Every structure is written in structure tokens, then in C-alpha cells.
A protein has these predicted regions:
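Histidine-anchored nucleotide/phosphate-binding helix
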Residues: 22
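Active-site-adjacent pocket-lining segments in enzyme domains
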Residues: 4-8, 13-16, 27-36, 55, ...
Length: 191
């Protein structure tokens, strides 16, 4: 059975943190719905890139039809998502049903607002740790996986964030195969 992912975005979201994980999830043949949190047909990213969505938030009748809920960071996109009561409720519902919840960069503030990070290790873009309720903040790891919660630091690790989502959902060699196909190991010697 194909795993389904709800990928929410709002105006001012970081485009790289949206597109890189989306690309990797679709390479892994996950069914990903790109959904506007503001109920528009498109959003404008933090760097003025227009992103056409698959669905609007009001189209979602039951968030539990998804296996994961994911959001990119960026500002003011993360703040808009945090201030969206429906997004907060979706995150609470998914987390309480032990489904995957994932956020990158500034977006872990949404998980914190939903009460998800209290007992979880987490990371975020530097400086946002002060807004998180995580009892175990990790500033050294690019991506943190703690049970059904994945957090990541920012744009440079968006690809790794996508791999971890795929790895969590599929629990097979798919993520590693995609890493090889995308030449990620080449970076090891070049950064």
C-alpha cells in the first residue's frame, strides 16, 4: 500500500525546504499532496517563487488518511502555519495517532505550539530553539529523528530531511538507493 504524505505550505515558506523533500518523497513513489494552508490555489515562497498546490486545506476531510504530515520552514511561512488553528489540530491528531510529523528550519515552532516537542529531542534553525518546548534540543545534528517526530535545521539539509522521511515511512533501502542515485556520497569529500 502506497504511503500518503500531507505537505502543507503557506506564503513565505522556504522553497528549498519544500521542493527538495517533495522531490525525494516522489522519487520514492510516496503519494504526496502539496496543500495550501491558506486555502489558496498557489502560494508565494520566501524568495518570491510561485508554488501551485495540489489541494487546499479545506479539501482535507480526514487528516488521518495520511501517513505523515510535513511542513517546510522559512519566514513568515512558519509563523503563518503556527497561527493556523487547523494546522495545529492536524499536527496534534497525527502525532496522537503515532503518525509521522516532520518540520524543518523555523517550522518546529508549529510542533511546539501543538505540544509535540515537550518530550522529544529536536533541532531547528539556529535561534529558534528559544521558541521550542523541547527538553532535549540538539544543535549539533542536521536532522533529528525521535520516534514519530522528525526535525531538521534548515535549507542546506533539506535533502537529508527528505531522506529521513522516506526512510521512516518505507523502512527499506529506498532512501539509500535515492541517496546513491542523487550522488549524495560525492558531497562527503567536497564540503
Amino acid at each position: 500500500m502506497t504511503k500518503k504524505v500531507a505537505l502543507f505550505v503557506d506564503n513565505g515558506g522556504e522553497e528549498l525546504e519544500l521542493i527538495a523533500p517533495l522531490d525525494i518523497m516522489r522519487r520514492a513513489n510516496l503519494e504526496v499532496d502539496l496543500i495550501s494552508a491558506n486555502n489558496a490555489e498557489y502560494v508565494i515562497g520566501a524568495h518570491n517563487i510561485k508554488i501551485i498546490v495540489d489541494k487546499k486545506i479545506n479539501d482535507i476531510e480526514d487528516i488521518l488518511e495520511y501517513d505523515a504530515i510535513v511542513i517546510p520552514g522559512g519566514m513568515p511561512g512558519s509563523t503563518l502555519l503556527r497561527n493556523n488553528n487547523k494546522i495545529i489540530e492536524f499536527f496534534k491528531t497525527m502525532y496522537n495517532e503515532d503518525k509521522l510529523v516532520a518540520a524543518i528550519c523555523a517550522a518546529p515552532i508549529v510542533l511546539s505550539a501543538a505540544g509535540i516537542l515537550k518530550d522529544r529531542e529536536a533541532t531547528s534553525y539556529p535561534g529558534f530553539d528559544k521558541e521550542l518546548e523541547s527538553q532535549s534540543y540538539n544543535s549539533k545534528k542536521a536532522v533529528v529523528v525521535d520516534k514519530n517526530v522528525i526535525t531538521a535545521q534548515g535549507p542546506a539539509v533539506a535533502i537529508l530531511f527528505g531522506y529521513e522521511i522516506v526512510n521512516y515511512l518505507l523502512k527499506d533501502e529506498t532512501a539509500n538507493n535515492i541517496k546513491e542515485q542523487m550522488l549524495l556520497p560525492v558531497l562527503k569529500d567536497n564540503i
